[in-house]
């Protein structure tokens, strides 16, 4: 997925991780006796229970969610197996190395287990755990559009072009919020103080509470959508939701397995809504699923607008001011 405002991304290839496992020795005898475990060809290494092979379709765990993925490379290093996986339907810049304990066999049984934990089978296939029919790349005849500058969050592209799947408007008041946010961070060099209260988790909970109060219940599909939105926020924030001068703050605030959704608030959640149409162009949805998703997005934006004075910060602070207070 393109990232106009994140730090420069590097598309790592498997060659960057896997070296030549063959020894350059003078004889077969030397090769067999003068080598350690790391230099053995992969075929000679023992395969532990649950070993996954190159090209195998799997369920891979990321940010507490399982997604459909494919194993591209396998490596035995530091006394453990590691797997380079590609998440189906995602840009290759999301490919990553993960450990054995983050993989599940792609089986009906495992899919059912995830369903019992709150993810529906179709949702596992989606980058956001939403019910979709399948993942597929963008059609070659769909224009990518002009390349935007590195340090910007696109605040004007709030309506999806007609040749894409999803279309919703960002209310004028929230669009102004985005523009003010842009000016504070990029021009005035001020940041939102972290951690935010309420954070993204808290905002989504408040939204659920409002739906419960309004309708007397919350549907399973809405809970699934909100869970997917949270997972997607956690994955997308460091990649495309930060301005360059926010990155140091991110590195200092999000570490040790902390989820961005527990640290950041409405300001960055709103940035995600700007990006969602562009990101969901890769997802092929049934018509009724698309309408449900779109209606929920519109309603969440309406909720953000209605509670704008409570959910969004009124003042941004200079970095020096925050560092002085922390000291």
UniProtKB/Swiss-Prot annotation:
GO terms for cellular component: nucleus. GO terms for biological process: epigenetic regulation of gene expression; regulation of DNA-templated transcription; regulation of long-day photoperiodism, flowering; regulation of timing of transition from vegetative to reproductive phase. GO terms for molecular function: euchromatin binding; methylated histone binding; promoter-specific chromatin binding. SMART domains: Agenet (SM00743), CHROMO (SM00298). SUPFAM superfamilies: Chromo domain-like (SSF54160). Residues 52-101 form the Tudor-knot domain. Its main location: nucleus. Residues 162-327 form the MRG domain. Pfam families: MRG (PF05712), MSL3_chromo-like (PF22732). Disruption phenotype: No visible phenotype, due to the redundancy with MRG1. Mrg1 and mrg2 double mutants are late-flowering under long-day growth conditions. The keyword Hydrolase does not apply. It is found in: Nucleus. Residues 1-40, 133-156 are annotated as: Disordered. Ubiquitous. Mainly expressed in the vasculature of cotyledons and leaves, and in roots and inflorescences. Keywords: Chromatin regulator, Nucleus, Transcription, Transcription regulation. Interacts with HAM1 and HAM2. Interacts (via MRG domain) with CO. Component of the NuA4 histone acetyltransferase complex. PANTHER family: MORTALITY FACTOR 4-LIKE PROTEIN, PROTEIN MRG2. Chromatin remodeling factor. Acts as a 'reader' protein by binding to H3K4me3 and H3K36me3 to control histone H4 acetylation. Increases the transcriptional levels of the flowering time genes FLC and FT. Binds the chromatin at the FT promoter upon interaction with CO. This is Protein MRG2. It comes from Arabidopsis thaliana.
């Amino acid at each position: 997925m393109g990232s106009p405002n994140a730090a420069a991304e590097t598309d790592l290839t498997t060659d960057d991780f896997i070296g030549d496992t063959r020894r350059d020795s003078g004889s077969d005898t030397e090769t067999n006796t003068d080598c350690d475990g790391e230099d053995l060809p992969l075929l000679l290494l023992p395969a532990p229970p649950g070993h996954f092979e190159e090209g195998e379709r799997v369920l891979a765990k990321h940010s507490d969610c399982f997604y459909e993925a494919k194993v591209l490379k396998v490596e035995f290093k530091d006394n453990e197996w590691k797997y380079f996986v590609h998440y189906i339907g995602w840009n290759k810049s999301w490919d990553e190395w993960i450990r054995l304990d983050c993989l599940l066999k792609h089986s009906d049984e495992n899919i059912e287990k995830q369903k019992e934990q709150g993810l529906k089978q179709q949702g596992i296939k989606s980058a956001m755990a939403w019910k979709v029919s399948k993942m597929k790349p963008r059609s070659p005849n769909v224009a990518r559009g002009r390349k935007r500058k590195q340090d910007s969050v696109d605040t004007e592209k709030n309506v999806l072009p007609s040749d894409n799947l999803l279309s919703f408007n960002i209310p004028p008041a929230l669009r102004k919020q985005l523009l003010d946010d842009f000016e504070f961070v990029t021009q005035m060099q001020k940041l939102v103080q972290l951690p935010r209260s309420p954070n993204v988790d808290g905002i989504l909970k408040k939204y659920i509470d409002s739906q419960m109060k309004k309708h007397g219940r919350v549907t399973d599909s809405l809970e699934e959508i909100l869970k997917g939105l949270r997972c997607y926020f956690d994955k997308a924030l460091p990649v495309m939701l930060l301005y360059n001068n926010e990155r140091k703050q991110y590195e200092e605030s999000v570490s040790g397995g902390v989820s961005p959704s527990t640290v950041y608030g409405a300001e960055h959640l709103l940035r995600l809504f700007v990006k969602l149409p562009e990101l969901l162009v890769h997802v092929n949805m049934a018509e009724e699923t698309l309408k449900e998703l779109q209606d929920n997005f519109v309603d969440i934006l309406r909720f953000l607008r209605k509670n704008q004075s409570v959910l969004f910060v009124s003042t941004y602070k200079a970095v020096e001011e925050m560092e002085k207070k922390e000291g």
